[in-house]
Curated annotation (Swiss-Prot):
Belongs to the NF-kappa-B inhibitor family. There is a cross-link at residue 21 (Glycyl lysine isopeptide (Lys-Gly) (interchain with G-Cter in SUMO)). It comes from Homo sapiens (Human). This is NF-kappa-B inhibitor alpha. A motif (Destruction motif) lies at residues 30-36.
Length: 317
């Protein structure tokens, strides 16, 4: 019988010898790369690597794409950060755009600047940062309100303080005189909503306590009577309100107390108002009626109605 030929035993090339072989191959590759370069080329490459420097470059203003992005409501990135009360993000944006007045004073579809929104969302620290960065406090929204108008309407004393303290004197006097599209000054709005502390502050800063509404001539004192607010009446009198100032129809604040429930207001104003401004003036309608009566006379044969019918029968007068 034939026997199968024995196969030669195969020895696995594993272990230390295999690792040495791989290292030797890698060394050969590195050596071959170095050997292919001349000494002058190698020195030049090292020199160039040593001369490489990374220098930060300032990105030119206006090239930031996030400044150009607007929502369908016309809100910029800064508007949105303020609306969502992301204070850290808002402060960082303000820091980056400081001095960029076009971006800081950009108005959305409701003509609101970031400063308007900071007041609306009751964030006085953001309002202060915006003013410091260059935001204009005199810009108006679609209702003609400056940021100070909104702060007075909302009764936020902190925002009022920031806006009045951060404004220069000419700016402040201009804002205090400004009326919105309803004819109201900041003092009028504070009076209408009964914020006595803000009223006192505005008057101390130079607001005209006797400023009249353009539409009908009411002063803050007239408004206080209309609202039946005796505490506001007392404060305005203390601040120098003129009790004898009349509206464009000729009514003094005291005359507006007739038919109103507060006797306290009537007593306060009655002691100070001129006597001829205490009685209600005769209306034009009554005068015209009296005038017509004088000239309208009928004889016995000329009655104003001669065709009266009752139950189908004509009445004989």
């Amino acid at each position: 019988m034939f026997q199968a030929a024995e196969r030669p035993q195969e020895w696995a090339m594993e272990g230390p010898r295999d690792g040495l072989k791989k290292e030797r191959l890698l060394d050969d590759r590195h050596d071959s790369g170095l050997d292919s370069m001349k000494d002058e080329e190698y020195e030049q490459m090292v020199k160039e690597l040593q001369e490489i420097r990374l220098e930060p470059q300032e990105v030119p203003r206006g090239s930031e794409p996030w400044k150009q992005q607007l929502t369908e409501d016309g809100d910029s990135f800064l508007h949105l950060a303020i609306i969502h009360e992301e204070k850290a993000l808002t402060m960082e944006v303000i820091r980056q755009v400081k001095g960029d007045l076009a971006f800081l004073n950009f108005q959305n579809n409701l003509q609101q600047t970031p400063l308007h929104l900071a007041v609306i969302t009751n964030q006085p620290e953001i309002a202060e940062a915006l003013l410091g960065a260059g935001c204009d406090p005199e810009l108006r929204d679609f209702r003609g309100n400056t940021p100070l108008h909104l702060a007075c309407e909302q009764g936020c004393l902190a925002s009022v303080g920031v806006l009045t303290q951060s404004c220069t004197t000419p700016h402040l006097h201009s804002i205090l005189k400004a009326t919105n599209y309803n004819g109201h000054t900041c003092l009028h709005l504070a009076s209408i909503h009964g914020y006595l502390g803000i009223v006192e502050l505005l008057v101390s800063l130079g607001a005209d306590v006797n400023a009249q509404e353009p539409c009908n001539g009411r002063t803050a004192l007239h408004l206080a009577v209309d609202l039946q607010n005796p505490d506001l009446v007392s404060l305005l009198l203390k601040c120098g309100a003129d009790v004898n100032r009349v509206t464009y129809q000729g009514y003094s604040p005291y005359q507006l107390t007739w038919g109103r429930p507060s006797t306290r207001i009537q007593q306060q104003l009655g002691q100070l108002t001129l006597e001829n401004l205490q009685m209600l003036p005769e209306s034009e309608d009554e005068e015209s009626y009296d005038t017509e009566s004088e000239f309208t006379e009928f004889t016995e044969d000329e009655l104003p109605y001669d065709d009266c019918v009752f139950g189908g029968q004509r009445l004989t007068l």
